[in-house]
Amino acid sequence: MGMPNKGVVLLDGQALAYNIEEDLKYKIQAINTQTHKRPKLAVILVGKDPASITYVNMKIKACERVGMDFDLKTLQENITEAQLLSLIKDYNNNQNISGVLVQLPLPRHIDSKMISEAIDPNKDVDGFHPLNIGKLCTQKESFLPATPMGVMRLLEHYHIGIKGKDVAIIGASNIIGKPLSMLMLNAGASVSVCHILTKDINFYTQNADIVCVGVGKPDLIKASMLKKGAVVVDIGINHLNDGRIVGDVDFTNAQKVASFITPVPKGVGPMTIVSLLENTLIAFEKQQRKGF
């Protein structure tokens, strides 16, 4: 990895996620003592995509660590849209299920947008339902998508101010880039979102106080593209042929320029998963209050 510069601080998502998990474990135990109930997350996995299987396993292990119940449904690649919608409907109507999550990407013959919209917004712990996205845009309380929520928590934990800062976000996905840009905007940043059609990404990154990237391209962000003292948030996860897992940033060199940087792994990844657990607990508590 090379020696970091003396001044750079690694944004340790793993350590922060561990602390939040301990807190969740305590809360869930207290709820269980009082009500004999536990939050329960339903996870739907379609097909055998290796990365999806890995992510689902990580989510389930995290549920186990905090004492949250889960229900995992693994479905064949060739399941019909109607069958999947029917399963989601069952989970929506099941009072013991607090949150419903469909692991993306889905096979080509299934319309992901329609599936996201089929989940009850009150159980949409991924924060992908149009109603929750709309609430995010209008700053109403909603389930925040887990990765952007995790990024904001990580920056907050390290007292990295966002108000008045220039932020460059590379990647305009509905899951990460767009909601993250909205959270940054809500926190008072001036935000530029770059994507495949952006003429000169350097122009945006070199002027940014905070650079967030999540597109799935190793070494996309080089040290020369960063201004001295930038905060670098690497949301990319790439599995290299030699078995290494790296992000989208040339970490070895970028850490010589940055003031703060997330490692990959152990940076944003653990924060994503713990944010999902937090959303599930919030969903559970809201449903209990409604006498659901």
From Swiss-Prot:
Keyword Chaperone assigned: no
Record keywords, A-Z: Amino-acid biosynthesis, Histidine biosynthesis, Hydrolase, Methionine biosynthesis, Multifunctional enzyme, NADP, One-carbon metabolism, Oxidoreductase, Purine biosynthesis
GO molecular function: methenyltetrahydrofolate cyclohydrolase activity; methylenetetrahydrofolate dehydrogenase (NADP+) activity
PROSITE patterns: THF_DHG_CYH_1, THF_DHG_CYH_2
Key word Oxidoreductase present: yes
Subunit structure as annotated in this protein's UniProt entry: Homodimer.
Gene3D superfamilies given in the database record: Leucine Dehydrogenase, chain A, domain 1, NAD(P)-binding Rossmann-like Domain
Name of the protein in question: Bifunctional protein FolD
A GO cellular-component term linked to this record: cytosol
GO biological process assignments: L-histidine biosynthetic process; methionine biosynthetic process; purine nucleotide biosynthetic process; tetrahydrofolate interconversion
Organism for this UniProt entry: Helicobacter acinonychis (strain Sheeba)
Task of the protein: Catalyzes the oxidation of 5,10-methylenetetrahydrofolate to 5,10-methenyltetrahydrofolate and then the hydrolysis of 5,10-methenyltetrahydrofolate to 10-formyltetrahydrofolate.
